[in-house]
Design a protein with these regions (language model features):
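Beta-strand-enriched cores of mature, soluble protein domains
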Residues: 16-161
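Bacterial N-terminal signal peptides
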Residues: 2-11
Length: 161
C-alpha cells in the first residue's frame, strides 16, 4: 500500500500543471471578403505581430484565418499560425472559435507541429481571449502545461540555433 501511494504521489507531482501565459499583439490585414447574403459575410485575413510569455521568451508570429459572420457574430473561425521564438525555434498552431461577437471572443488553439527542440509541445492545447480595435489584435493565451513542457519552454532563451 505504501509503495502504491508513493508511486501515485510521485506521478501526480510529475503531471502538476503550470499556467503558461502568452501575450500577443498583431495587425490584421483582410485578404478577401464576400457578402454572401444580407446578413452573412466571409473573410480571409492574416495577422502578423509579436509575442511575449511569462517565462521570459519573446518572438514573432503570424496567422492565416477564414471567418464566417452572421449579423456581425462569429459563426465559424479557423486558422493556422506560426510562432517563432527568439532562438528561431518555432511551432505551428491551429485555432478556432465560434458563436461570438466579431470584435472579441474566446477560442482554442493546439500545437500541431514544431521544430525539433519544441516537438514535445505537439498536442499542447491553450485557451485564448482576443479583442480587436480597428485592425489591431490583442490576445492572451493560457495553457496548462506539465513541468516537462515548462522546462522546455524555460530553456528556449538558453539555446542558440
Amino acid at each position: 500500500l505504501i509503495l502504491i501511494l508513493t508511486v501515485l504521489f510521485i506521478s501526480c507531482g510529475n503531471i502538476s500543471a503550470f499556467d503558461y501565459m502568452v501575450e500577443l499583439h498583431g495587425k490584421r490585414k483582410i485578404i478577401k471578403s464576400y457578402h454572401i447574403s444580407e446578413d452573412k459575410k466571409y473573410l480571409n485575413f492574416i495577422l502578423e505581430g509579436t509575442f511575449t510569455d511569462n517565462l521570459g521568451n519573446y518572438g514573432v508570429w503570424d496567422n492565416a484565418s477564414i471567418l464566417t459572420l452572421q449579423n456581425n457574430n462569429v459563426i465559424n473561425l479557423q486558422g493556422y499560425g506560426k510562432s517563432t521564438y527568439q532562438n528561431n525555434q518555432f511551432m505551428y498552431t491551429k485555432g478556432f472559435r465560434n458563436k461570438q461577437e466579431q470584435q472579441t471572443g474566446v477560442g482554442k488553439i493546439e500545437v500541431v507541429n514544431a521544430s525539433n527542440f519544441l516537438k514535445p509541445l505537439i498536442g499542447m492545447s491553450c485557451t485564448y481571449a482576443v479583442n480587436f480595435y480597428l485592425d489591431n489584435a490583442y490576445f492572451i493565451q493560457k495553457c496548462k502545461i506539465t513541468n516537462k513542457k515548462k522546462k522546455i519552454l524555460t530553456s528556449i532563451a538558453k539555446r542558440k540555433e
